[in-house]
Amino acid sequence: MTKSILFLSVAALLLPACQAGEKPASNTAAANATADLDAGADEQAIRGQVDHWLKLVKAKDAAGIAALYAEDGAVMPPNGPIGKGHAAIQQTWAAMMGTPGFDLTFVPEQILVSSSGDMALDRGTYKLAVAPNGTAQTDTGKYVVVWRKVGSEWKAAADIFNSDLPTSGG
């Protein structure tokens, strides 16, 4: 009889604990739904930044492009040094866009927003045309931009890209 009372007492104590454990699951579901909505809004905000970036590229506005980066942001072009900070980023972009025939487009293929909502990864492809010696050359490649939320605005923290073309000289 003592064992039965003990068992019922333990069961009576555990039942409310189990029911309380169910409530966070519904709260978690609500939090996940809110996070999904926020991630969707954040993805759209980043796509807006990408669209703005493309307009600045067409206008060859290196200062405007540099402003899209975080203060401590970096651009990492192929075959060149890392440009850290707004001044170096502006200089890097100005040099690239100063190439005769420069035309660049890029398309995000995937944007992943962190569960914390303050970082995101943008992976995509680009097409580049230049004519440095009067002869048109084209390139296709891929890029990764790591975005950081600064206040309410998304800024590029790191930007790296490279060609799909084979290197010359084998």
Annotate the PLM regions.
Residues G21-P24, T140-L165:
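Short beta-strand edge/turn micro-motifs at domain boundaries
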Residues Q19-L68, G170:
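Short, low-complexity N-terminal intrinsically disordered segments enriched in polar/charged residues
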Residues V113-A120, W147-E153:
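A short, structured loop/turn motif at beta-sheet edges
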Residues G40-A45, A62-S115, Q137-T138:
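A solvent-exposed, acidic/Ser-Thr-rich amphipathic alpha-helical stretch
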Residues D118-L128:
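A short hydrophobic beta-strand element
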Residues W93, P108-V113, Y126-L128, K142-R148, ...:
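Hydrophobic/aromatic beta-strand elements that line small-molecule binding cavities or substrate pockets
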Residues L15-A17:
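C-terminal motif of bacterial Sec signal peptides marking the signal peptidase cleavage site
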Residues M1-F7:
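Bacterial N-terminal signal peptides that target proteins for export
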